[in-house]
Amino acid sequence: MLVVTTNDLPGHRVQEVLGEVFGLTVRSRHLGSQIGAGLKSLVGGELRGLTKTLVETRNQAMERLVEQARARGANAVLSFRFDVTEAADVGTEVCAYGTAVVVARE
């Protein structure tokens, strides 16, 4: 599955546009991570626990996007984006989205 942020795929021709696909996940915050992050924010620096959680969350959202695109018969996703939102002060929502297409080499 080719997943790109561009609106086209060099060297390929779009044969069919299958529509929007997305992968969504919401992760709750771990109390220990929140306390550690609060203390770390006082002195500065990377919040490694939160960074790890966000990377895992983004990867899961992307995996779900790819699953949905495959289920619709796509072999590529164009205009791929992430949207990250705080969900009611209890977690983080990550949505990966794009346009599912069938492409062929030119």
Swiss-Prot record:
SUPFAM superfamilies: YbjQ-like
Coiled coil (residue ranges): none
A Pfam family this chain is assigned to: YbjQ_1
Entries under InterPro entries matching the protein: UPF0145_dom_sf (IPR035439), UPF0145_YbjQ-like (IPR002765)
Protein family: Belongs to the UPF0145 family.
Listed name of the protein: UPF0145 protein SCO3412
Organism: Streptomyces coelicolor (strain ATCC BAA-471 / A3(2) / M145)
